[in-house]
Amino acid sequence: MLKQFFFICIFFALVSHAQVAGTSIFSFLNTSTNARQTALGGKTLNLLDDVDQPTWNPATINSNLNKQISANYSSFLAGISIGSVSYAHNFSGIFKTFHSNITYVNYGEFIQADVDGNETGTFNASDIALALGTSYQIPNSHIYIGTSVKFIYSSIANFSSTGLALDFGAIYYNALKPYTFSLVMRNIGTQLSTFNGESENLPFEVAIGASYLPENLPLRWYLTVDNLQQWDISVPNPSNQTTDLDGNTTEEEISFIDNALRHFIIGAELFPKRAVNVRIGYNFRRGKELQLQNVRTFGGISFGFGLRMNKIKLNYAYSRFHSASNVSTFGLSIDLNKNRTEIAPTKY
């Protein structure tokens, strides 16, 4: 069964192309809005019991998510508000379960000025994405594949842009095994309309993920390796520049190992199946890019907790970006299935 999964991985890799988020339009699509996801580092791909997870890996859509709804909100950096709502529902047919999601970003109000700097009023900017997805189990295997389609709308003052994107995911899951493996290709698509007539790339991304739950230890580990479509994702940190006595500035030199580590995100969840659990994660790239010279900022670290009360689950995440900025994310999940006595366990 694992061989089938690896063949799928190779196929996805062959059709991928280079694109790193941050150099493209609609970059908000690669920002986590889920409190549980955020606490684990921001890009976990293997959460099988979370109705928000299909936003990152549509292969995790499964029947146990039926009639679960979740809402998340974060007062992000610089007064930016981000949030999302997810819902899953079972139907009859080959594609039994469908998942829907709305993600939005409100950048707030800005001062509008003419070319001479004279203020002429204010304007707003926002992004929104609507997604619908489903999954399918490959017969006689433990491999599940999924896809979702996203309609994207972005506006800045009187200008706007729309786009259409697809996510593809695959996951190897066996209820008798303590591990899972995932492969995801996200944001494959194009702009339907542009801001100024110039077409821009979407934030295409390829990532693999894994999770492992030791037999006698209630601590599930998560690993994500992102941006596989491009090896060099390093950006010199201005804080690490050096200046000699003549005033010549030398940028930070990023080693092979340093760049490799920036692809990694790790997370851990203590008591993952209990009513109360604790989470922690570390994003190596964020930690390196927001590092301050000779100052311990703890950038890249995130942590949080989950609290389940009957059919309601509260999630909280605290993300450390910089010594001058931190982000709190709140999540609320409700199980609307009257025939289920508890939140679905971690299985299909």
Describe each PLM feature range.
Residues M1-Q4, N140-S141:
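Positively charged n-region of N-terminal signal peptides that target proteins for export
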